[in-house]
């Protein structure tokens, strides 16, 4: 999977838009970061993943999930896109989208 593929499906969701963060491509919802591409052009910085869940993900699939010391104290997991499939990325991205999108948009999504 590539960031462009992630971008294509995420931009179909209401309130998602292209942006940049730390000089890299990013996806934003109402000006808040949904996810961004790391400088290595292969890792997705996935926000909204609690540390205990991150540990479980890494333990179960270390070829896909990882983190660096920089992210140790944050609810973030890194996803190696070259090893990931949409079925891995989309649920985490959608969950974080739900926390950033307006209540109205989330309600409309749930009702559709």
Q: Locations of the language-model features?
A:
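Charge-dense, helix-prone N-terminal extensions
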Residues: 1-112
């Amino acid at each position: 999977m590539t960031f462009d593929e992630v971008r294509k499906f995420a931009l179909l969701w209401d309130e998602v838009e292209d942006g940049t963060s730390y000089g890299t491509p990013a996806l934003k919802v109402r000006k808040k970061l949904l996810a961004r591409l790391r400088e290595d052009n292969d890792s997705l910085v996935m926000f909204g993943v609690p540390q205990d869940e991150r540990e479980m993900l890494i333990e179960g699939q270390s070829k896909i999930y990882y983190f660096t010391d920089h992210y140790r104290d944050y609810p973030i997991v890194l996803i190696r896109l070259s090893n990931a499939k949409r079925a891995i990325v989309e649920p985490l991205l959608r969950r974080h989208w739900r926390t950033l999108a307006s209540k109205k948009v989330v309600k409309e999504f749930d009702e559709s």
